Every structure is written in structure tokens, then in C-alpha cells.
């Protein structure tokens, strides 16, 4: 399990390939990459600034990863989240799950993203034509996370 919160850009393909390296027991790797969009809620977005709570954010991500590891037979799990200034088209987040079988990898990846969106302390501020604005959580994110508690 690896958790990284960083300002530096990353290569999603390289991250995905690294999950499989030196582990022949892996039969499936599922990855998710989230990108900065150039629009949100009908507004053009010129960029984004991501803030986090150092120490607390990593701890929250570690807890999410640990719970995923308890629920599914994962061989590897990686969570990488960027902070700082990001431009449209840049990757924000990578979640990679590796398992012997695909269903565990798919389910774990969905779970991690659903919980990351609702339980990890990140704050997004978008630059729009009307000026900067903080992005609020979506009800759909809460509903997605809720399904794992049933």
C-alpha cells in the first residue's frame, strides 16, 4: 500500500504499469485517473488550487486504503493525490488496485474513490470568469459512498 500527496505532476500510465512490476501473482490491475476539467456546473474553469491538511489527509487516505484491504484480497493499492495549482487537463488523482482477480480490483477502486471524495480532507478552489470559488461536495458523491455501508 502506498499513499502519496504531492505537488509534482505524475504520469498515469507509468503509475499503472508500476503496480504490476515484480509481482506475478497479480491477475488484474484497475486504475482510476481524475483530471482537472475546463468546466464545472456550467462555468468555464481556468485552473484549480487544491489544498489539504498535512498529516491528517495522509492518515485519512491510509484509513481508506486499510479498509479496502480488509474488504478485498488486494495485492497492491496505490493512492496518489496532487495538491497546489493545477491546470485543465492535468491529472489530479490516481487510484490503482491490484488483485489476483478483476472483481476485487474493480470494487476496491470504486470504494477508494467514493470514500476519498467524501472522507479525505481536500479543498478545491476553481478559477472562473466570475472569480475564484470553492467547490462544494456533491450529493451524488455522498450517495455513492453510502452504498458501501449497506
From Swiss-Prot:
Keywords: Molybdenum cofactor biosynthesis, Transferase. Gene3D superfamilies: Molybdopterin biosynthesis MoaE subunit. SUPFAM superfamilies: Molybdopterin synthase subunit MoaE. Substrate binds at residues 35-37, 101-102, 117, 124-126. GO terms for molecular function: molybdopterin synthase activity. PANTHER family: MOLYBDOPTERIN SYNTHASE RELATED (PTHR23404). Converts molybdopterin precursor Z into molybdopterin. This requires the incorporation of two sulfur atoms into precursor Z to generate a dithiolene group. The sulfur is provided by MoaD. This is Molybdopterin synthase catalytic subunit. It comes from Pseudomonas aeruginosa (strain ATCC 15692 / DSM 22644 / CIP 104116 / JCM 14847 / LMG 12228 / 1C / PRS 101 / PAO1).
